[in-house]
A protein has these predicted regions:
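Short, glycine-/small-residue-rich phosphate/pyrophosphate-handling segment
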Residues: 105-146
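Residue-level recognition of beta-strand->loop/alpha-helix junctions
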Residues: 37, 146-147
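N-terminal beta1-alpha1-beta2 submodule of the flavodoxin-like/Rossmannoid cofactor-binding fold
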Residues: 1-82, 88-99, 103, 153-169
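A short acidic, glycine/proline-enriched capping/turn motif at secondary-structure boundaries
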Residues: 86-87, 121
Length: 169
């Protein structure tokens, strides 16, 4: 299975460690994995101009780093979203990517999704609801959510749990 991990964090700390643990577990199980650093990309929010559903034929009118993300999004069997919680939500970069893939509607190939979240405080409910809504709308089967809070972030026990989760896919 081909897996794309969309890391929404602009930093190299907790979420990056979770994404790396997932990658290690998935590759150990024989899957092909690509990690995309969405948190470092310049992706604008959706303009709701509907160009993509008319003249654009599935392509967004905006020219930004979404173009770097789309090949992996379109060619993967599974998409893993990874993000720290910033003010009760995934990062703005990941949210912009979620909005902008509206241009294609549903993923061309992907059938599965998972979510990795890190937080200092553990306020995950809004981000999980947003992910589940996105998965339901796009027809992706939710394979699970892994969270790490405070001291758990980057702990070997938590990273081992994430590796094991990825190996079982």
């Amino acid at each position: 299975m081909k897996i794309a991990i969309l890391n929404g964090s602009p930093r190299k700390e907790n979420t990056a460690a979770m994404a790396e643990a997932f990658r290690q577990g998935a590759e150990a199980a024989g899957h092909e994995v690509e990690v995309l650093q969405v948190g470092k990309m310049k992706i604008n929010g959706c303009l709701a101009c509907e160009y993509c559903h008319g003249k654009g034929e599935g392509k967004c009118i905006q020219k930004d780093d979404l173009e770097k993300l789309m090949p992996a999004y379109l060619e993967s069997d599974m998409i893993v979203f990874a993000s720290p919680i910033y003010y009760f939500a995934p990062t703005a970069q990941l949210e912009a990517a979620w909005q902008r893939v509206y241009c294609i509607g549903k993923p061309a190939k992907a059938t599965k999704a998972a979510l990795l979240l890190s937080s200092a405080s553990g306020f995950y409910d809004a981000a999980i609801a947003q992910y589940k809504g996105f998965a339901a709308y796009t027809g992706l089967q939710d394979m699970g959510v892994c969270t790490a809070t405070g001291e758990e972030n980057k702990s070997e026990a938590k990273l081992a749990e994430i590796r094991a989760f990825a190996e079982k896919l």
